[in-house]
Amino acid sequence: MKMVEIKCPSCGGKLKVEDSQTKLITCEYCGSQFLLDDEKVQHITNYNIYQTTPSGKDQGNGAKIALGAGLACAGVLLAAFILSSGSGSSSGPRTAPPSIPAYTRPAGYLGKEGEAGEEVREEETAPKADSPLFHAMTWEMFQKEPSEISPEDLAGVRYLKVETSLETDRVWYSFDDPYSEKEPVVQTASFGAMDWEPQDAAAFTGLVKLDLGSGLSRVRTLKGLKELKGITAGNVEISGIKDMLDDPAQITELQLKGITSMEGIASFENLERLTVRDYPDTNLKQLVPLKSLNYLSLEDTVDSDSIISTDKDKIRVKDYSAISVMCGLKSLYLNSDIIKDIGFIKGLPALEDLTLEDTAVISLASLSEVPALRSLTLLGNNKVQDFGPVGTAPGLTSLSIDKMTSQPDPDLSSLSGLERLEIKGFMSISSIRGLSSLKELSIHNCNVDQADALSSLTGVERLTFYSVWNSQGNLRNLDFLKGMTGLKYADFTGNLDGTGWSGYNYLVEVYGDVSSIFNHQGLEELYLDNGKFEINFDKIKENPSLRVLGLRNMELHKNYYVESYGGMTSVWYDDVKLGEHMDILSRFPNLEELYLDSNELADLNFAAGLKNLKRLGLKDNYITDLSPLKQAEFLEYLDIRDNPVGEVGDVGNGVEILQ
């Protein structure tokens, strides 16, 4: 007698017999119910398992995870007791298994990622791709009927990502290699409720990177995808992914979540990039043999301080010391409130990029002992006692700090090679004065009493600036930008989702005139969306360099009078409507993109002079007549949602219109 462990074909859980008379069995983990059906062939007894429709559930849902008799006969995912006569063979015809309904989502249901529903076949060859979503996406890709699509067409798709939800299926695809040095062009498509068999993805035989999320759990084989290098999956064990492939050594990137074991990871001997959400072990020793690993991302989603967490008993990494011997690591991302010390990064010879998010790290002293470090990101980490060591990493070219503590700001003045800087929660920006190598600068949630320090940053080309304050209240002007002679991009839009540090205003509010920014020579993109300030329109001069302008939802004022006393500030002003000053747009003759949402505009007469306009956003206004746009011969995109527009007319020819 040979005994084989009984497992649920849906989730792999343990099955138990509920009723020996009706032969009803139930999965102890997911609750799925099955019936045993005997097939007697000489001395062999096979048990075919069919899932019954749970009481009160839609019949379609019951069929979703039905498995055919071929599954049981293969003896791969099922449980069985096999009684043999010793010959190891059988004779006589076998009873054909009953047909199992194909997986069909009920009307209006698009399927949940990770549901079992794929009938497993004995043969290695994947079934012919034939699901409605497959046909929809291939039409989007090739504009051909199914019969006209060749294997060569399908092989041309190099990247594929599919997400399904209750209302929408979304597909991302590219004909470019995502691992090449050239940035791939990724296209997207959205569809309504459609059936989708993730196994159909194997029809794209030239895939280099595949992201099916939890849908990969319904894929039996990826054999034949010889060029596949990257896989993103959820709720699929590593050993299962290994068995899908011709050779796991071909894979260089894995992005995983919802796994319970690292078993099989050693088979991916050429793995270069690994991302794991909720690593299923207490240490990282299994990763040490992966000598090609150069990127590691580990996210622990458990909140140790939560009093309502249901994950208190979850297996978590408590020992990160194995990282100290991963000498090939170039990039490391860690998110875990278990991490209190980062001594394991000391001396990593190749580490160039380090991100620490929401850790419990107390000291950053180890940063000075990472010789190759070029990029550092610190997000959260509210237990840090001293940010000073950040300034002792002279090789840094990129730095992002979200300082969520009252500890002193680090002195950044010695980081002479810094090219990109993002700071949040700083009490002073004086230490950035003189950072002549800076090209990108983002300042949020900071005290800007020393805003004049920005005038010394002549090399900065991109500036993002919002949610700031000073000891006198709000800013009075933006004149400190005049010294930033290299500025090409300025974004004062703000953080509209309301997330950020402390309770400060998330937008830019200036108690005075900001017209000087419109005259900034060399400025190509300017975003002042949702701003509250004055614009002295008479001071705005012609600026031929400006190509993109965002003026969404403007709250304009004039005649500011500000009075402060005893820590209280009172402000008086008069309101101004942007629509009364649209003639200023003629001073930007090379404008290509203009966004004017939510400004109570009633006409488009201003557009007649914008000959180079390609994109125009007018959402939520009072526009009724689009005829002035006929003169915008290069117009490609028009957003007129939430406007009482009647006929689009000739404007619609060749223009993408959101209406």
State the predicted function of each range:
Residues 58-97:
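Alpha-helical transmembrane anchor segments and their immediate juxtamembrane flanks
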Residues 31-41:
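Short Cys/His-rich micro-motifs in 6-15 aa windows
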Residues 8-11, 27-30:
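Short cysteine-rich clusters marking metal-coordination/redox-active sites
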Residues 17-26:
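Short linker/helix segments within small regulatory modules
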